[in-house]
Amino acid sequence: ATKKEELNIPQEWLHVIEKADGSWKKIILYNTGIAALLTHNEKWVGKIENVLKIFEENQDEIALLWRPHPLIESTMKSMRPEVLQKYMMLKQQYIAKGWGIYDETADVDRAVVLSDAYYGDGSSVVQLYRQTGKPIMIQNVEIMT
């Protein structure tokens, strides 16, 4: 599917995306990757925490579609165990609150087509996203606000 209308969107995602009047919020693909984790460690997890807070405050207008690298948790377990607990807590809170979408499916194309803009770490997804012509902003872990 290359158009939003053709996508198979889960009902729980639509619950996050649709406004009360039936129109759609702007959807931001938030992609978090392994290279940034390995470079920035605790600071990277702190950045995610701040990003989630900002998007939660703006959830009436913006739907966040958080898509972490599929190997992020196993990488933390083996290479950065000191950040795993805080990361897992953030992930579980995000999912439990239900104001955003947590996408751990294999279907990266759906996330790219569905979203209106990309925010997050530099990764192979950026190359894919660039082909859409939609806005891309790479997060800077050094800037916390």
What are these regions (language model features)?
Residues I34, P70, E142:
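Residue-level signal for short, function-critical loop segments
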Residues A1-K43:
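A nucleotide-sugar donor-handling region in carbohydrate enzymes
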Residues Y30, L64-W66, I138:
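Structural beta-sheet core signal
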Residues I27, A63, D116-A117:
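Structural motif
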Residues A36-H40, I72-M76, L128:
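Short catalytic/ligand-binding loop motif for oxyanion handling, primarily in non-cytosolic enzymes
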Residues D103-M144:
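A donor-sugar binding/catalytic signature common to diverse glycosyltransferases
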Residues Q59-E104:
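Catalytic donor nucleotide-activated moiety binding site of glycosyltransferases and closely related
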Residues K43-E61:
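Short hydrophobic signal-anchor/transmembrane segments that target glycosyltransferases
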